[in-house]
Regions:
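Gram-negative bacterial Sec-dependent N-terminal signal peptides
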Residues: 1-21
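Active-site histidine-anchored catalytic micro-motif
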Residues: 22-206
């Protein structure tokens, strides 16, 4: 009798979990590398190599994201964004356009050196009405004060919000949301390196 009750409880738990997962939006993370996926020899060292960690590792580091959406990760490339190329840009645009009907939004993990160029290119070439959000970090994932995990979590918040749709490609970093045509990198060492003109999170979602 006890075994039957345990079995029934397990079945109900699985069923409830399945229903809960079905109600969550589906978000696809396209990973390209960058500092957000960087790895250093020490948690207190500023020396690191960009694009070392794969997307599964980044997702596992922020389990809270799974309460926001059904997360699917896809590793596009593993590079520092200084090595970003036309080939990768085209691959990102084609991937988003091809998968648009099968997801509720996209997040692209990216280095900050060429994030503005990638955002602008995708803004002109992506033909998808779902949210497309770029996110990066100024400190590698292995550093004690890494900013990537919170930035990644916030990018999922933005990508799952229906108000983000049909606004063009966005950049979400440091608690602000930026339009692709308004973003530029101005500082190379501070976490508040990404600057913008006029377009703020409060304006988008007020």
């Amino acid at each position: 009798m006890k075994l039957k009750k345990l079995a029934l409880s397990a079945v109900l738990s699985i069923a409830i979990s399945s229903v809960y997962a079905a109600e969550l939006p589906n978000i696809t993370i396209l990973a390209t590398g960058g500092t957000i996926a960087g790895s250093g020899q020490s948690a207190v060292s500023s020396a690191y190599q960009a694009g070392q960690l794969n997307i599964d590792t980044l997702i596992e580091a922020v389990p809270e994201m799974k309460t926001l959406a059904n997360i699917k990760g896809e590793q596009v490339v593993k590079i520092g964004s200084q090595d970003m190329s036309d080939e990768v840009w085209l691959k990102l645009a084609k991937t988003i356009n091809n998968q648009c009907a099968n997801t509720d939004g996209f997040v692209i993990t990216h280095g900050t050196d060429t994030m503005e160029e990638t955002a602008y290119f995708l803004d002109m070439t992506v033909k998808c009405d779902k949210p497309v959000v770029l996110v990066g970090a100024m400190r590698p994932a292995t550093e004690k004060s890494a900013d990537g995990p919170l930035n990644l979590y916030n990018s999922i918040v933005v990508a799952k919000d229906k108000k983000s749709a049909k606004r063009g490609v966005l950049v979400a970093m440091n608690d602000v949301v930026l339009g692709a045509r308004d973003v530029t990198k101005t500082k190379h060492h501070r976490r508040t390196n990404i600057q913008f003109a006029k377009l703020r999170y409060a304006r988008l979602y007020s």
